[in-house]
Amino acid sequence: MKSKKGLVAASGSDSEDEDSMDSPLDLSSSAASGKRRRRGNLPKESVQILRDWLYEHRYNAYPSEQEKALLSQQTHLSTLQVCNWFINARRRLLPDMLRKDGKDPNQFTISRRGAKISEASSIEAAMGIKNFMPTLEESPFHSCVVGPNPTLGRPVSPKPPSPGSILARPSVICHTTVTALKDGPFSLCQPIGVGQSTDVPQIAPSNFTDTSLVYPEDTCKSGPSPNPQSGLFNTPPPTPPDLNQDFSGFQLLVDVALKRAAEMELQAKLTA
């Protein structure tokens, strides 16, 4: 009889230890005695229902919210108790179940904490790769665009004359200047840095002179052609020139250009 009572007592203690992990910890203490209360055990029927569900879903032992609510109704436990039981069961009961099936518990997610750590490491790796990728904003393309923006370079064009050297027919001169720029060669320009010289290289005056504008009969009537160095396309001096300067050479060039334009219009009408 004594041996039977000892066996019953031992089995009872084992069952209590086994069921003790099924209940959450009770850390509340009484103010008078200061001793910790003995934690209570969940009902065996409720624990068996939870064990059966854990065994059926041992490869993915994470019940959804609907399943937790259903288990709470079946076991007559609160949802918090069901959640705590599964948290402990995944660490204590699930590895033994997987080993009995011949599976490695390390290949299955026992706790969500490991999954969060792996996700965080993958996100950090992706962010590290992104930081090393160069962007177009960090390395802009420098190109030369003809426009008023001074940071992109300066096109090769003559400087405007000073106010004292304005001619009587500025529209014709602007037209011939644009034509000469179209006929002249283009050169690449680069952004000018701080401290560099801002002088634009001069282009030979022959590039801006159209020899087809002058004919033998025109030279006989008008006399010798003016000196190309007279200052039409050259850079003006820093100080304004004398107001009494002779501009007969410029006027002669304008007259020749107007005459040539009239001849071209007449030829166009005849051919049409």
UniProtKB/Swiss-Prot annotation:
Tell me which UniProt keywords the record has, alphabetically. Answer: DNA-binding, Homeobox, Nucleus, Repressor, Transcription, Transcription regulation
Task: Family membership, please give it.
Answer: Belongs to the TALE/TGIF homeobox family.
Has the keyword Transcription been applied to this entry?
A: yes
Q: Which GO terms describe its molecular function?
A: chromatin binding; co-SMAD binding; DNA-binding transcription repressor activity, RNA polymerase II-specific; JUN kinase binding; RNA polymerase II cis-regulatory region sequence-specific DNA binding
SMART domains reported in the protein's UniProt record: HOX
Q: Biased-composition ranges for Polar residues?
A: 222-233
| Sequence motif: CTBP-binding motif, positions | 24-28
**Could you tell me what this protein is called?**
Homeobox protein TGIF1
Span list, region Disordered: 1-41, 216-244
Pfam families, sorted: Homeobox_KN
Q: What's any GO biological process attached to this entry?
A: positive regulation of fibroblast proliferation
Carries keyword Transcription regulation?
A: yes
Report biased composition (Low complexity) as residue ranges.
Answer: 22-33
InterPro entries named among the record's database cross-references: HD (IPR001356), Homeodomain-like_sf (IPR009057), KN_HD (IPR008422), TALE_homeobox (IPR050224)
Function statement: Binds to a retinoid X receptor (RXR) responsive element from the cellular retinol-binding protein II promoter (CRBPII-RXRE). Inhibits the 9-cis-retinoic acid-dependent RXR alpha transcription activation of the retinoic acid responsive element. May participate in the transmission of nuclear signals during development and in the adult, as illustrated by the down-modulation of the RXR alpha activities.
Q: What assembly does the database describe for this protein?
A: Interacts with SMAD2. Interacts with CTBP, SMAD3 and HDAC1.
Q: Which residues bind DNA?
A: 35-97
What are its GO cellular component terms? nucleoplasm; nucleus
Q: Where in the cell is it found?
A: Nucleus
